[in-house]
UniProtKB/Swiss-Prot annotation:
PANTHER family: METHYLTETRAHYDROFOLATE:HOMOCYSTEINE METHYLTRANSFERASE RELATED, UROPORPHYRINOGEN DECARBOXYLASE
Annotated Pfam families: URO-D
Keyword Heme set for record: no
Residues the UniProt record annotates as site (Transition state stabilizer): D75
Name of the protein: Uroporphyrinogen decarboxylase
PROSITE patterns for this protein: UROD_1, UROD_2
Name of the gene: hemE
Amino acid sequence: MTDRKKLLRSLDGEVQKVPPIWMMRQAGRYLPEYRATRAEAGDFLSLCYNSELAAEVTLQPIRRYGFDAAILFADILLIPDALGADLWFVTGEGPRLSTIETMEEFNKLKPADEVHDHLAPIYETVRILSRELPAETALIGFAGAPWTVATYMIAGRGTPDQAPAHKLMREAPEVFDALMDRLTEATIAYLSMQIEAGAETVKIFDSWAGSLKGEAFTKYALEPTKKIIAALKTKHPDTPIIAFPREAGDGYIGFAKATGADCVALDNSVSAAWAAEHVQVDGCVQGNLASSHMVTGGQALVDETREIVQAFSKGPHIFNLGHGITPDADPENVQLMIDTVRSA
């Protein structure tokens, strides 16, 4: 019997009868204890930068559910904040940022290696969690991928089709490429410090990768992820890395080999059976239950969960949702999912 944590064993390539389980956004508004702590912090950004409270909300779903991993509570837009972009959150609408559309605006950003003072509270959160998590619980750090973060910085907000970023890519490629390079370097620096602070694995979230097609997907989703992973592996060769090019479709095929990722996370737009045949052949996969099941529950949740576990049973697998859990989820449905996975 090994004492290596279940999540890390899957990332090592081990096939486990009962896969490790955690959820994207497992610390979130669906939990009453999270809502209470967020109210104490005052606002979302204050919660991210308050190391003690950020650690507390990270620990809450571990106490309640006993997940096999905790993911650092933070936000993908902390890097632009640290680079000097203005960032604020509008209640009910989400993030707002100062826009980067010209070289003059880009040149106001800080160099990538100057983000650490601003992000010091995040590293302290990681250190607290390293001390306080149960011995069997793995700690996941994370960052947004350069493309996804760039879409917010260019538009100044989330957009349904990422049109402003695509427009800048075509009309001012020198500005777009400079921003992508800056974000790539800042992401390397940020994740490396998370690992040094105690993160046992890190995940790169490319939430809008699916809006890139063909050569653009290769250049702006795959290649930056590859560069980040190569830099991290040079400095931290024993730290496994999870990549999530959400809604990549056929782009999931070969993504692990092309980027050097130890695991590819899958959204629920691809079936588990398809992914087992085309993606899991290269190693560990993570996913991919539709988050809507956390709202509706019932036998459909049980059946789909069992189907996913079975589909991925012949290779290394981490059970997760295909996207983050939503605020309207029922905490009891989360427990039902966990019980189903662990009794599979």
